[in-house]
């Protein structure tokens, strides 16, 4: 059955700290194109790779990868809250195949996800319940992180598993590109913040609002040039886009975790979701990128990209 891909950045600051209208119009046009691409493909199933931002996965038990057979959106930053329409049978089938491939992936019957999943689904298909999904969490913010080669192998294993489902599968990667938002690092965080990173589930409305306001303020400061966070790196972003489009994904195995941070910020690791999605596409054979959008958007603290791709018949 056919497969297709849409990889996209997300930002909780969309609609909260927006750039000038010309940039918004360009982003809106790119998402309009992506939505038409998805609608024309008409997926039976969306396999979505996304990170978490200490809203659903914490240091009390923090796997590098996790497949959800059921998932609940926490509704942060105004995203849709509630259960995703998860295809449980497909999730189990994918998990079994991935484990059989030698990739040690965790599995959850009660996964909690945040805007990394919800915003992508809402932007592409209108709702977290519009199309059955298999949500796959990839740790992208909480050190220690494994080598990116394992992410590529995970994606390939998921792609092989998806090919057996007899469904039209859309692979979605949500995150990145270069960005260094104010996400706390466990090694340097004060004790009270560490406790929240270990088990910060179910914050009060006031606690969540205060946390979100800090990020909004950071976005405003970053756009004004006064934030003490790492700059965006459009050269790095474009290099990543070129490598993913080339289909030669094994070269990514040489990229070190330190290199990601030095070049593109701590949260650049979110491009692991793109790497997994493209690797899943590669399991079906050659692919062709059909559209690419990229802009530096300081107000959203993100090198912001959107790409689509289709399989190429041999």
Swiss-Prot record:
Keywords attached to this entry: Aromatic hydrocarbons catabolism, Dioxygenase, Iron, Oxidoreductase
Pathway listed: Aromatic compound metabolism; 3-phenylpropanoate degradation
Catalytic activity from the UniProt record: 3-(2,3-dihydroxyphenyl)propanoate + O2 = (2Z,4E)-2-hydroxy-6-oxonona-2,4-dienedioate + H(+); (2E)-3-(2,3-dihydroxyphenyl)prop-2-enoate + O2 = (2Z,4E,7E)-2-hydroxy-6-oxonona-2,4,7-trienedioate + H(+)
Molecular function, one GO term: 3-carboxyethylcatechol 2,3-dioxygenase activity
Matching Pfam families: LigB
EC number(s) given by UniProt: 1.13.11.16
Active-site positions on this chain: 115 (proton donor), 179 (proton acceptor)
Record protein name field: 2,3-dihydroxyphenylpropionate/2,3-dihydroxicinnamic acid 1,2-dioxygenase
């Amino acid at each position: 059955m056919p497969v297709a891909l849409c990889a996209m950045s997300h930002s909780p600051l969309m609609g909260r700290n927006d750039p000038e209208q010309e940039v918004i119009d360009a982003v809106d046009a790119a998402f309009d194109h992506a939505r038409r691409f998805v609608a024309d493909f008409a997926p039976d199933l969306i396999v979505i790779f996304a990170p978490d931002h200490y809203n659903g996965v914490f240091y009390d038990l923090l796997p590098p990868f996790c497949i959800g057979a059921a998932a609940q959106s926490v509704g942060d930053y105004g995203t849709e809250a509630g259960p995703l329409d998860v295809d449980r049978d497909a999730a189990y089938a994918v998990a079994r195949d991935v484990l059989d491939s030698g990739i040690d992936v965790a599995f959850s019957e009660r996964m909690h996800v945040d805007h990394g999943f919800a915003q992508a689904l809402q932007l592409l298909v209108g709702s977290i319940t519009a199309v059955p999904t298999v949500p796959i969490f990839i740790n992208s913010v909480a050190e220690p992180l494994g080598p990116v080669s394992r992410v590529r192998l995970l994606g390939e294993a998921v792609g092989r598993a998806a090919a057996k489902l007899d469904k039209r599968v859309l692979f979605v990667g949500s995150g990145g590109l270069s960005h260094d938002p104010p996400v706390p690092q466990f090694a340097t965080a004060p004790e009270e913040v560490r406790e929240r990173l270990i088990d910060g589930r179910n914050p009060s409305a006031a606690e969540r609002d205060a946390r979100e306001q800090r990020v909004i303020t950071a976005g405003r400061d970053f756009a004004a040039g006064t934030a003490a966070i790492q700059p965006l790196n459009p050269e790095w972003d474009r290099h990543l886009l070129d490598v993913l489009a080339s289909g030669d994904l094994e070269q990514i195995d040489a990229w070190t975790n330190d290199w990601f941070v030095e070049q593109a910020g701590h949260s650049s690791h979110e491009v692991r979701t793109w790497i997994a999605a493209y690797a899943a596409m590669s399991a079906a054979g050659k692919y062709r990128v059909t559209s690419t959008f990229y802009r530096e958007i300081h107000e959203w603290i993100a090198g912001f990209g959107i790409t689509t791709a289709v399989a190429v018949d041999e």
